[in-house]
UniProtKB/Swiss-Prot annotation:
GO terms for molecular function: protein disulfide isomerase activity. It catalyses: Catalyzes the rearrangement of -S-S- bonds in proteins. Keywords: Disulfide bond, Endoplasmic reticulum, Isomerase, Redox-active center, Repeat, Signal, Stress response. Induction: By stress. The gene is erp38. Belongs to the protein disulfide isomerase family. This is Protein disulfide-isomerase erp38.
Length: 369
């Protein structure tokens, strides 16, 4: 009976160990797993009797689980440095727990000196590897985590970049965090906009904070496309305030939550021409004028949307009621929901353009009622 009980306990222990997402390291596998694998690895040197190690254990396991989807890009591992003292000595471990980051290219690790909470550890991994932890029950963050080594590569190019310089202990930063996540999600479909964050209190972020004049937290800076000189953001910190700011600066037409406003995709010069048609002008004359106007457009985005104006005019030449029917059809599809964000954007732009063709008729119908 005692033997059976021992076997059951051993089996349960083995099952628990098998489920762990944290890699166990010993002298015989350390070099192969950490130094020769080419994969960045965070290693905890711990002792079973250490109270701080016991407190860290569930957080460390959660970190490993949140990164398990990217195990080909980053590893979370641990060493019982009380049992394997040679390994601890090899890497200068003098207390427990000690966390060291190996970049997969060098035998010289970087000491982790941040907090032992999940957010701090996750942010550290994101800064070092670009891999973001997937927290249980939530989608991966769309905020771009930057540091001293990566911020230069993120600004000055073909993107407008909005950066929040924060500190883990800052209460206002914690209040901003969920709004910042929403903002990143709102602009996720806009390739020319990046929503980013720098832990300006971390050793890997202090240089950037000093360079860009950060003296308090949070500090928000806007780097326009093609510029490495930031503009200070001093407006409100609600999603609506931040969305409005980015729309004005980047020429986007987002609404809080990620939708597009009623102007998105429309072109003022073509709207004036369409107004002549809805006002009673000849369709053939309007279509010809629109084609000439399109030739003068130089913005690539405008040219893309201009094609749809011309397509609608062509359809109208074959069916007078096309714009009204297509407007109603696309609005119905949008109301049903269940579409991918890119498809929602595409249909919203078409509805906005079609509205220019039908709004005169809609106004007249209201007047008759």
């Amino acid at each position: 009976m005692v033997l059976l009980k021992s076997l059951v306990v051993a089996s349960l222990a083995a099952a628990v160990a098998a489920k762990s997402a944290v890699l166990d390291l010993i002298p015989s596998n350390f070099d192969d797993v950490v130094l020769k694998s080419g994969k960045p690895t965070l290693v905890e040197f711990f002792a079973p009797w250490c109270g701080h190690c016991k407190n860290l254990a569930p957080v460390y396991e959660e970190l490993a689980t949140a990164l398990e989807y990217a195990k080909d890009k980053v590893q979370i591992a641990k060493v019982d440095a009380d049992a394997e003292r040679a390994l601890g000595k090899r890497f200068g471990v003098q207390g427990f727990p000690t966390l060291k980051f190996f970049d997969g290219k060098s035998e010289q690790p970087v000491d982790y000196k941040g907090g032992r909470d999940l957010d701090s550890l996750s942010n550290f991994i994101a800064e070092k590897t670009g891999v973001k932890a997937r927290k249980k029950g939530s989608a991966p963050s769309l905020v771009n985590i930057l540091n001293d080594a990566t911020i230069k590569g993120a600004i000055g190019g073909d993107k407008n970049v909005l950066v929040a310089f924060t500190a883990p202990w800052c209460g206002h930063c914690k209040n901003l965090a969920p709004t910042w996540e929403k903002l990143a999600a709102t602009f996720a479909s806009d390739p020319e906009i990046t929503i980013a964050k720098v832990d300006a209190d971390a050793p890997t972020g202090k240089k950037s904070a000093a360079e860009y004049g950060v003296s308090g937290f949070p500090t928000i800076k806007f780097f326009p496309k093609g510029s490495t000189t930031p503009e200070d953001y001093n407006g409100g910190r609600s999603e609506a305030d931040l969305v409005k700011f980015l729309n004005e600066k980047a020429g986007t037409h987002r609404t809080p939550g990620g939708g597009l406003d009623t102007v998105a995709g429309t072109i003022a010069a073509l709207d004036e021409i369409v107004a002549k048609y809805t006002g009673g002008a000849s369709l053939a004359e309007v279509a010809e004028e629109a084609k000439e106007a399109v030739k003068s457009l130089k913005n690539s985005a405008e040219l893309k949307y201009a094609d749809y104006y011309l397509r609608v005019l062509d359809k109208l030449s074959k069916s007078e009621g096309y714009a009204t029917k297509e407007f109603a059809r696309l609005e119905g599809i949008l109301k049903k929901g269940g579409l991918a964000p890119a498809k929602v954007d595409e249909l919203t732009v078409k509805v906005n353009v079609l509205r220019k063709f039908v709004e005169k008729a809609a106004e007249e119908a209201k007047e008759e009622l």
